[in-house]
């Protein structure tokens, strides 16, 4: 008789992870619920919902009659996620801590805790995503040695597991999983909600006494900020660096700000005394000035070229067609739930890529992740380190005057005018 499979499910205190645990129980697995505490609310005077979330996760386990564990990754989160968050903002970039958290905390720390401490055969989360493995295939996976060197040997990991988009395309969360490095973790992960819609998940919760999580507002934004003012929060950790708001059209000074790193491209600039809204289109890291333009559709907000850091490829590193041709057509997005944009990737020798979008996109920003897709498959992602000239710059013929948008320590393989080396 085959032993009952043990699945350790990450519980956030929300409806998605609660229903994920419920569905695992229905499949006959031995399920253990684990709540991860990643931020110490005692560090701040602001509001943090971690304690309430933990209580809700514990109550889920009581309703489902499964064991409950709580584990603290406060130190790891600070070192690997929050410190990176601050460093990126200090460089004037716009980081995505959710992507970094999944990479370092959920699919590294939590995965190893579940396997090594709780004896899990597999882990599960409430993410809306799928893999190329069925449940039984997940349980048949053996430990794979961590790859060495710049790229994984494509013959070392046969039939690598693929990360696939969820049935609910609007709720799909492969974007946030695009930096999960460990094939070992991914091939031993179950996503019970991958084939379901959010509305159906809510229906399941309502029919199974999970009303306390069903009624909660969906968590948005960063857990460590809560309801606090973002600018005030950031200035608790970073020194103010006052500068000017300058019109991109005539170089007129329109106002002052407390730090160029507080703004991301596409964001509305809060400039007192102006009737119409102005939007951030450039940042000068040397002088500390923020360039702004009127109208939300100003051409200075649109670009069709960017360069990433070395891309993390999930299943095939890098894809064979990209290695062979040095170019590859696919789609990308740099914000969750934005429409996929057709693009062409150009591979550099150091594993970075140039991304040329078929059409200019609004509000590209360094520090964000460009996440690549081919059909239903999420191929991986790379951090945006450099932007090409805006449509406004090209219209004025000022390509050479483009404001630097990355740290000098991150110099890319430059082509003329920031064009990819084709």
Swiss-Prot record:
Residues 96-98 are annotated as: Interaction with target base in tRNA. Residues 402-422 are annotated as: Disordered. It is found in: Mitochondrion. One of its GO terms (cellular component) is mitochondrion. Its EC number is 2.8.1.14. ATP binds at residues 10-17, 36, 126. The active site is at 101 (nucleophile), 223 (cysteine persulfide intermediate). The record marks 127, 268, 368 as: Interaction with tRNA. Belongs to the MnmA/TRMU family. PANTHER family: MITOCHONDRIAL TRNA-SPECIFIC 2-THIOURIDYLASE 1, TRNA 5-METHYLAMINOMETHYL-2-THIOURIDYLATE -METHYLTRANSFERASE. This is Mitochondrial tRNA-specific 2-thiouridylase 1. It comes from Pongo abelii (Sumatran orangutan).
């Amino acid at each position: 008789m085959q032993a009952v499979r043990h699945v350790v499910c990450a519980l956030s205190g929300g409806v998605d992870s609660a229903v994920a645990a419920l569905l695992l129980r229905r499949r006959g697995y031995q399920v253990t619920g684990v709540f991860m505490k990643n931020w110490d609310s005692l560090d701040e005077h602001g509001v943090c919902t971690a304690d309430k979330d933990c209580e809700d996760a514990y109550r889920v386990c009581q309703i489902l009659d499964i064991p409950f564990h709580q584990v603290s990754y406060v130190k790891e989160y600070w070192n690997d996620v929050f410190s990176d968050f601050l460093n990126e903002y200090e460089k004037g970039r716009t980081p995505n801590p959710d992507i970094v958290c999944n990479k370092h905390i959920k699919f590294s720390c939590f995965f190893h805790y579940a396997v090594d401490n709780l004896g899990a055969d597999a882990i599960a989360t409430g993410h809306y995503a799928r893999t190329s493995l069925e449940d039984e295939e997940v349980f048949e996976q053996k430990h794979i040695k961590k790859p060495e060197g710049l790229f994984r040997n494509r013959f070392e990991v046969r039939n690598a597991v693929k990360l696939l988009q969820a049935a609910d395309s609007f709720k799909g969360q492969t974007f946030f999983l695009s930096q999960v490095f460990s094939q070992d973790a991914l091939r031993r992960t179950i996503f019970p909600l991958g084939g379901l819609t959010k509305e159906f998940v809510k229906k399941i919760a309502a029919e199974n006494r999970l009303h306390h999580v069903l009624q909660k507002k969906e968590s948005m934004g960063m857990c460590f900020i809560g309801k606090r003012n973002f600018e005030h929060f950031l200035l608790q950790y970073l020194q103010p660096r006052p500068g000017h708001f300058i019109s991109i059209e005539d170089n007129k000074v329109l106002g002052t700000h407390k730090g160029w790193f507080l703004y991301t491209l596409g964001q509305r600039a809060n400039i007192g005394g102006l009737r119409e809204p102005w939007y951030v289109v450039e940042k000068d890291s040397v002088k500390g000035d923020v360039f702004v333009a009127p109208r939300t559709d100003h051409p200075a907000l649109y670009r069709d070229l960017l360069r990433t850091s070395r891309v993390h490829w999930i299943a095939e590193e890098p894809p064979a067609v990209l290695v062979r041709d040095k170019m590859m057509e696919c789609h990308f997005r740099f914000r969750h739930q934005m429409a996929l944009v057709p693009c062409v990737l150009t591979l550099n020798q150091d594993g970075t890529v140039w991304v040329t979008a078929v059409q200019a996109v609004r509000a590209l920003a360094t520090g964000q992740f460009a996440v690549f897709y081919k059909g239903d498959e999420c191929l991986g992602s790379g951090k945006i380190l450099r932007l090409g000239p805006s449509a406004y710059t090209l219209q004025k013929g000022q390509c050479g005057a483009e404001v630097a948008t990355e740290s000098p320590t991150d110099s890319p393989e430059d082509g003329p005018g920031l064009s990819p080396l084709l």
